[in-house]
């Protein structure tokens, strides 16, 4: 792990013009400070990862409690367009869409975030792997199908874990498609197991 951190930190430092006098470990520790600082705002106006959450907590009732509960509408935080920038980002003159969780809190509110996470979590809980069939009673194709379920499971969990870290799940349609495809595949596999085991 230490070797991986050192390599990543040195690559980060060389790619983004970091201070050559700093060690790889100090670059890594500085990046942790950026992640966990609750008041970190870059010169460009982009908020740090934790800062996005704390900023939302302090300013979410811009037009009343409805904004906190249901958000301010899709694209309200868009900072990547000069043609149609999000009006919440323009209102504060800040980049509020640095993480998917921040985007969701501003755009669909706390109710939307809870429903989104609860729906995925419910699928993962219900579809968690259980030993139902004996592998000796299954064909090779069935084993291959069942063997893919843990990969879909881990992929969906990884997508959920990315919400407070990156905006990628909200801005990449293909990743959203893959997330719902993985969840759908888990449901199909689970249903196939129930049918083959005689439980409906």
Predicted regions and their residues:
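Membrane-interface junctions at the ends of membrane-embedded or membrane-associated helices
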Residues: 133-135, 187-200
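Hydrophobic alpha-helical transmembrane segments and immediately flanking/interface helices
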Residues: 31, 181-191
